[in-house]
Amino acid sequence: VLKGKSMPSQEIILAITRQESEFDPKANSYAGAKGMMQLMTYTAKLVAKQMDVTYSKRKLTSDPEYNINLGTYYFNSLLNDYAEVYPFAIAAYNAGPKRVRQWRRLNGDPSKNKIDYVNWIELIKFEETRNYVQRVLENMNVYKYMLSQKPVKLEKFFN
């Protein structure tokens, strides 16, 4: 379904999926998010319509590929909305675009040089979202390294 489209890197999707569900296809959150990428049913319905695929609540937790395709498409739309600024898109994936708009207004906007990105992340009002953004960015770099399949040179850690 996603072939031929410019999509986010494998590393960021792995990082989000790890943080959302630890790769559990049957994951259900207390808030109602479902599947590996923890999609809310409203969001999943909207994205399925945008992708021109049939929405299936059951498939959110029974078909990992379906869930990942919807989640990837949604995250890609957030990346496009935020001009490829990962902290904004990641925060929006977790807390919603409305909250990111609020935080950019209240805390300053790093894309307009009003504050740097690290401080912007630290000022995210919700501890869960603040930690989420930090963990996803960390995980993304771990997966980037893992997927490059370059051997770890341990001596650099001991100099």
Region locations from a protein language model:
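Catalytic glycan-binding domains that act on GlcNAc-containing polysaccharides
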Residues: 1-159
